[in-house]
Amino acid sequence: MQGLTLVGSVWLGIGLALPLLVLVVNPLLVYLVARRVPWRPIPVVTTFPSVSMIVAVHNGAALMETKLDNALALDYPPAQLEIIVAADGCSDATEEFVARYGDRNVRLLRLDEHRGKTWALNTAVAEAHGELLVFSDADALLPAESLRQLVAPFADSTVGGVCGQRVIGERHGALREAQACYIDLDSRLKHWESRLGTLTSNDGKLYAIRRALFVPLPPAVTDDLFLALAVVRQGRGFVFAPQARALIPTPSRGAGHELERRRRIVAASLHGIRLQKVLLDPRRYGFFAWRLLINKVFRRLLPLALLLVMGGTLLLLPGHSWAWPLLLLQLLGYGLAFSHLLWPKIGIQPPPLLGKVSATGFYVALGVYGTLLGVGDFLRGRQPEKWTPRKTDGV
């Protein structure tokens, strides 16, 4: 019995300490350190470097007209902006839509075979002429000033890359609200990290790097995180420009899509970190190495922490009365999360607050399960399936 108590105590301690480190200690420490760093205002743009905006797309005909009209309406000198659309083995009318813009600084790269996003981006970069490479998704619409805001930090020669701010354009529905809440919290961490000069994450909806710092993307990585880390590895900063906004629809199209999306992102991002594991060496990269380890590796282990908490609680039930309330609290949390699926089946409309808590819990549970599957894929060396995005509800 003493042995089980010891094991249960260790499991419970680790299971509680890991979320505390990731969700409380790390953000608080980043915030406190960032406050001691003098704020550097973003330089005023007086010159406009040449920009190549790259959009990789697979069967995105429903999006291209809106996307290209939006890109061409950006407040940026047309002579300094080229738009490259890499059509990754499209079988719909994507190429026909893009071809109509051929006389307006829009270049179409026809990639006959569907080989995935990394191949499309590598091919497009090889054709790009801009000093800066801007990457933007087909479903991301930019306010007129966004490109100027994204480019402005490059006036500082120590900056090698800039991350934009994603904004969910419509927030109707509990799942959308939950995802928007997560994005808002993540953006706060980016803001504090940016004061330290380097982010530990990036956003594929809108970001930019210097073309001279581009590293060809290997298979099965997330392009945004891999390129951000490549910039840091080359000794440049990667910062956040919150005014460079990208308006997007809800990232998840439903529970199944969110699960698949989270699984793929986790496996691919861990693979990308493994390929650049030198960044985890604090002797060379100092505080950044610890932040990367906590925010991008330990965060992926949170599902295991929840399993340890449950397992530790069960082992401590005999002879420890305080373990029973802890078990009930966990069961209540899981019950609230999965009640989100139950309400429609039994025809009950829950009170607004209960419905919101239930939907948020369900979104968190989906993310936890998808993360667990992604970690499993990474440990088994299972490559994520080929990039086949769902950018509209009908695609």
Regions found by a protein language model. Give the residues of each.
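Short aromatic/hydrophobic "clamp" motif used to bind/position activated sugar donors
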Residues: 133
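Short, acidic, metal-binding catalytic loop of nucleotide-sugar glycosyltransferases
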Residues: 69-80
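A conserved acidic beta->alpha catalytic loop
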Residues: 70, 87-96, 113, 140
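Catalytic donor/gating beta->alpha subdomain of glycosyltransferases that bind UDP-sugars
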Residues: 154-185, 219, 223-295, 366-369, ...
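Cell-envelope/extracellular polymer assembly enzymes that use nucleotide-activated donors
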Residues: 49-52, 82, 226
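Conserved donor nucleotide-binding strand/loop of the catalytic core
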Residues: 80-85, 95-127, 173, 177, ...
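N-terminal membrane-anchoring/stem segments of glycan-assembly enzymes
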Residues: 1-47
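Long helical/loop segments within the catalytic core of UDP-sugar-dependent glycosyltransferases
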Residues: 33-34, 119-120, 144-221, 363
